[in-house]
C-alpha cells in the first residue's frame, strides 16, 4: 500500500489515479495524520503531494522526510519538504512557472529507468531550491536543461527519499506514469 499525503491540491488525485494502477492507495490530508499514524498504517511507500504554500505550512510533510525511513517520493511541495527537512533553504524560483513545459536532464538513477534524457516535464511552482545549497545528504538528480539549471530532482544519500520539483502526474510530463511506476514497483517495493 502506498500512502499519499494530500497537501490540499487537486493534483493529488491525479497521483492517486497513477499510483492506483500499481498498488493499493490510502490518502490522508497533511493535517489528518502524524508520524505515529503513518507507522500504524505501515505503508510500502509514501507520496507527498503538491500543494499551495511553503513546506512549513504543509502539515506532516516535512516530518515524513525528517522522521521516517519509509520509501518516499515528494512531488513539487513534497520535494521542497524533503529539501527543507534536511536544512536546504526553499526560496523564490528565478521565475514563476505554472502550467509550462520544460526540458529536464536526469542522472539515470532508478526513478528515471526507461525515461529519455532529456525529457519534457510540466512545471507549476514559484519556489525552488539551489543546487549550491543542497547538503551532503541530498544530491541533485535532475535539473532544467537551460541556462538556469533549476533543481528538478533530489535523492537522499542514505534514506530511500526522492523529490521531484516537476509534476509527473501532469499531462505535460513525458513518461510521468513511468516515473510513478518506478517509484511504486521498484523503490517502494525494494
Curated annotation (Swiss-Prot):
<feature type="active site">
    <location>
        <position position="169"/>
    </location>
</feature>
<feature type="domain" description="Glutamine amidotransferase type-1">
    <location>
        <begin position="1"/>
        <end position="190"/>
    </location>
</feature>
<dbReference type="Pfam" id="PF00117">
    <property type="entry name" value="GATase"/>
</dbReference>
<keyword id="KW-0057">Aromatic amino acid biosynthesis</keyword>
<keyword id="KW-0456">Lyase</keyword>
<keyword id="KW-0614">Plasmid</keyword>
<keyword id="KW-0822">Tryptophan biosynthesis</keyword>
<dbReference type="InterPro" id="IPR050472">
    <property type="entry name" value="Anth_synth/Amidotransfase"/>
</dbReference>
<keyword id="KW-0315">Glutamine amidotransferase</keyword>
<protein>
    <recommendedName>
        <fullName>Anthranilate synthase component II</fullName>
        <ecNumber>4.1.3.27</ecNumber>
    </recommendedName>
</protein>
<feature type="binding site">
    <location>
        <position position="80"/>
    </location>
    <ligand>
        <name>L-glutamine</name>
    </ligand>
</feature>
<comment type="subunit">
    <text>Tetramer of two components I and two components II.</text>
</comment>
<feature type="active site">
    <location>
        <position position="167"/>
    </location>
</feature>
<dbReference type="InterPro" id="IPR006221">
    <property type="entry name" value="TrpG/PapA_dom"/>
</dbReference>
<keyword id="KW-0028">Amino-acid biosynthesis</keyword>
<comment type="pathway">
    <text>Amino-acid biosynthesis; L-tryptophan biosynthesis; L-tryptophan from chorismate: step 1/5.</text>
</comment>
<feature type="binding site">
    <location>
        <begin position="126"/>
        <end position="127"/>
    </location>
    <ligand>
        <name>L-glutamine</name>
    </ligand>
</feature>
<dbReference type="GO" id="GO:0000162">
    <property type="term" value="P:L-tryptophan biosynthetic process"/>
</dbReference>
<dbReference type="GO" id="GO:0004049">
    <property type="term" value="F:anthranilate synthase activity"/>
</dbReference>
<feature type="binding site">
    <location>
        <begin position="51"/>
        <end position="53"/>
    </location>
    <ligand>
        <name>L-glutamine</name>
    </ligand>
</feature>
<feature type="active site" description="Nucleophile; for GATase activity">
    <location>
        <position position="76"/>
    </location>
</feature>
<dbReference type="GO" id="GO:0005829">
    <property type="term" value="C:cytosol"/>
</dbReference>
<dbReference type="InterPro" id="IPR017926">
    <property type="entry name" value="GATASE"/>
</dbReference>
<dbReference type="InterPro" id="IPR029062">
    <property type="entry name" value="Class_I_gatase-like"/>
</dbReference>
